[in-house]
Swiss-Prot record:
Coiled coil: none annotated. GO terms for molecular function: 23S rRNA (guanine(2445)-N(2))-methyltransferase activity; RNA binding; rRNA (guanine-N7-)-methyltransferase activity. The keyword Metal-binding does not apply. Residues 43-154 form the THUMP domain. Specifically methylates the guanine in position 2445 (m2G2445) and the guanine in position 2069 (m7G2069) of 23S rRNA. It comes from Salmonella choleraesuis (strain SC-B67). Its EC number is 2.1.1.173, 2.1.1.264. Belongs to the methyltransferase superfamily. RlmKL family. PANTHER family: RIBOSOMAL RNA LARGE SUBUNIT METHYLTRANSFERASE K/L, RIBOSOMAL RNA LARGE SUBUNIT METHYLTRANSFERASE K_L. This is Ribosomal RNA large subunit methyltransferase K/L. Keywords: Cytoplasm, Methyltransferase, RNA-binding, rRNA processing, S-adenosyl-L-methionine, Transferase.
Length: 702
């Protein structure tokens, strides 16, 4: 009997143990990442040929203590390699692990190689050659602290390499993991199996091979025992012949069918080729179609199983599309696949929540470095009185109500951008803004006391409901997470897409960017203030400080201002402001753009203006500004500087976003200024619920 080890992906160890025991293995012991077992030579070949779950079959050769590189050399050389190697066999060494002595895996591999080669040289035998690409023997050495374990890898290449797949494309899951997913799905061979996002077809091919009793190793051309001196070719050929006979019989007797679809025609063609190479191409129907076109191929029965490894996203901007995909899949399953089972394997359990289905079972497994989950569902049969499930029903109803009211108002006003929802319901803590036929969801970061998993699932429900109510495609929904911004983080860049959208606001055309920054380039709550500035600007010299993207300057210019001066510290936003001005035919010397620290520029400027708009940050401590600024503390000093630039009879429109801001009327009076609060006049219906979003004042000489 041989002591052996079968490695596998973490989470599949118990499944592998059961498989090995069915093959005849004895003494099976599960450890993390694999199973120790015992078996004769025939079992070695059977496990290599038939294991669908093992990554490699390893034959341990010995262990040694390693306190120096000499210990490693002598420990490896103590093994009788001349009884392991066939004459002329090539080899490669795979070394993993480090300790205080062996600090480099390449150095460790070199010492092992030297020890093996010298073992032959000392016996005056031809030294074996190293072949790193396709060796006859693979020697594995694992160093754990002071112990080195030496073994022969009888697999050669990993056992997931079945020999049927085109290796040119990326594979989201290995064949061994795909086989485990099929086994855990609850699918019964002989019943239909469908994968609506099949990619290169791995799940379906592994299922078809399992169902037709086709050994996973049948198509492999190279093994790790080809240079092994103890290899028994007779037994191997018997094992191989048995596998071929069973495969022919299984294919001839199998009567059910498999269905695969994907939106990418190229991967579907690859899937067809893979299935043909696997010898089961006639059993699988592959089609080019996306999940939106998914339908039950057997509406009159029998019931089957839908299985898939749907895509998941690592970037925030990919989530709306993925949530929509999962939500659509869930609805399609309930509408068309009553009585069927569903099994999905995902690296994003939160996305599976968008199915709006309750899982009967779930399993955990590793897909490379990713922690994944497989969830199995049973789809209830639909009845005449079945009601369609709703997602985030309270939120959806409120959004629908707001849309009905605000859409009509916006159309009458001639605006395309407005706030549709602003945390109206505390449990749905987001803002939803419309920009033409686009929508932006801003999630207000939940407090630390809220369970992160629940908050994420709630957000996914919000996205699914928003897409449904607004009837927009997922690629026109942008998701952002908004946290309390401080100082220089206020305009932090989020992306590099550089995609601008042209929108209308009354008689102005403006550019917005929905993806690259936390804000879009247009503060929606200041919409009425901008219109008022346009109405006040005719024939006047207009100054716009802390101008952002210059939208107020556009309205002033369109309102007939004699000149506009737009000042901001950011080159990016000034260039954006210039684009906005040009879009509205406003260019030339009458429309100046100045890049400067606004407070510093204000103190040094000696020009005169009839109308000044200033919307400073609540607080700023930018490195590029000479000093910190606090709007509550410093607004009187700010007005003193502004008064110096204000012509007789001129007006300052002053706005800020500080909640609880208190205007120092006495301080203004000492400067000879009066202030009239116009906050309520500047709040439009879409911000009626949030009356503290900004405060706004008209300031004039007394």
């Amino acid at each position: 009997m041989n002591s052996l080890f079968a490695s596998t992906a973490r989470g599949l160890e118990e499944l592998l143990k059961t498989e090995l025991e069915k093959l005849g293995a004895v003494g099976c012991q599960v450890v993390q990442g694999g199973v120790h077992f015992q078996g004769d030579t025939r079992l070695i070949y059977q496990s290599l040929m038939w294991s669908r779950l093992a990554s490699r079959i390893i034959l341990p050769m010995g262990e040694c203590k390693v306190y120096s590189d000499l210990d490693l050399y002598l420990g490896v050389q103590a093994i009788n390699w001349t009884e392991i190697f066939n004459l002329g066999a090539t080899f490669a060494v795979h070394f993993s692990g480090l300790n205080d002595t062996i600090r480099n895996s390449q150095y460790g591999a070199m010492k092992v190689k030297d020890a093996i080669v010298d073992a032959f040289t000392r016996k005056n035998l031809p030294r074996p050659n190293v072949d790193r690409e396709s060796p006859d023997l693979r020697i594995n050495v694992w160093l754990n602290k002071e112990t080195a374990s030496i073994a022969l890898d009888l697999s050669g290449d990993g056992l997931h390499l079945r020999g049927y797949r085109d290796r040119t494309g990326l594979a989201p899951i290995k064949e061994t993991l795909a086989a485990a997913i099929v086994m855990r799905s609850g699918w019964q061979p002989g019943t239909p199996l469908l994968d609506p996002m099949c990619g290169s077809g791995t799940l379906l091919i592994e299922a078809a091979m399992w169902a037709t009793d086709r050994a996973p190793g049948l198509h492999r051309g190279h093994w790790g025992f080809s240079g092994w001196a103890q290899h028994d070719e007779t037994i191997w050929q018997e094992v191989k012949a048995e596998a071929q006979t069973r495969a022919r019989k299984g294919l001839a007797e199998y009567s059910s069918h498999f269905y695969g679809s994907d939106s990418d025609a190229r991967v579907i063609e690859r899937a067809r080729s893979n299935a043909r190479r696997a010898g089961i191409g006639e059993l699988i129907t592959f089609e080019v179609k996306d999940v939106a076109q998914l339908s039950n191929p057997l509406p009159k029965g029998p019931y089957g199983t839908v299985i898939s490894n749907p895509p998941y996203g690592e970037r925030l901007d990919s989530e709306p599309a993925l949530i929509a995909l999962h939500s659509l899949l869930g609805r399609t399953m309930k509408n068309q696949f009553g009585g069927w089972n569903l099994s999905l394997f995902s690296a994003s359990p939160d996305l599976l929540g968008s199915l709006q289905l309750r899982a009967d079972k779930q399993f955990k497994a590793k897909n490379g470095p990713l922690d994944c989950v497989q969830k199995n569902y049973h789809i209830a049969e639909t009845t005449a009185d079945s009601k369609p499930a709703t997602v985030a029903e309270d939120y959806a109803n409120r959004l629908r109500k707001n849309l009905k009211k605000l859409e009509k108002w916006a159309r009458q006003e001639g605006i395309e951008c407005y706030r549709l929802y602003d945390a109206d319901l505390p449990e749905y803590n987001v803002a939803v803004d419309r920009y033409g036929d686009w929508a932006v969801i801003q999630e207000y970061a939940p407090p630390k006391t809220v369970d992160a998993q629940k908050a994420r699932q709630r957000l996914f429900d919000i996205i699914a409901a928003t897409l449904s109510v607004l009837g927009i495609p997922p690629n026109k929904l942008v998701l952002k997470t908004r946290e309390r911004q401080k100082g220089k983080n206020q305009y932090q860049k989020m992306s590099e897409k550089g995609e601008f959208l042209e929108v209308s606001e009354y008689n102005a055309r403006l550019w917005v960017n929905l993806t690259d920054y936390l804000d879009t380039g247009l503060f929606l709550d200041h919409r009425i203030a901008r219109r008022m500035l346009g109405e006040m600007s005719k024939g006047k010299d207009f100054l716009n400080l802390f101008s952002y993207t210059g939208s107020a300057s556009v309205h002033a210019g369109l309102g007939g201002a004699r000149s506009t001066t737009t000042v901001d510290m950011s080159r990016t936003y000034l260039e954006w402001a210039e684009r906005n001005l040009r879009l509205n035919g406003l260019s030339g010397r009458a429309h100046r753009l100045i890049q400067a620290d606004c407070l510093g520029w204000l103190r040094e400027a000696n020009e005169q203006f009839d109308l000044i708009f200033i919307d400073p940050p609540t607080f700023s401590n930018s490195k590029r500004m000479e000093e910190s600024f606090d709007v509550q503390r410093d607004h009187v000093a700010l007005m003193k500087d502004l008064k110096r630039l204000l012509r007789k009879g001129g007006t300052i429109m002053f706005s800020n976003n500080k909640r609880g801001f208190r205007m120092d009327l006495e301080g203004l009076a000492e400067l000879g200024l009066t202030a009239q609060e116009i906050t309520q006049k500047t709040l439009s219906p879409d911000f009626a619920r949030n009356r503290q979003i900004h405060n706004c004042w008209l300031i004039r000489a007394a």
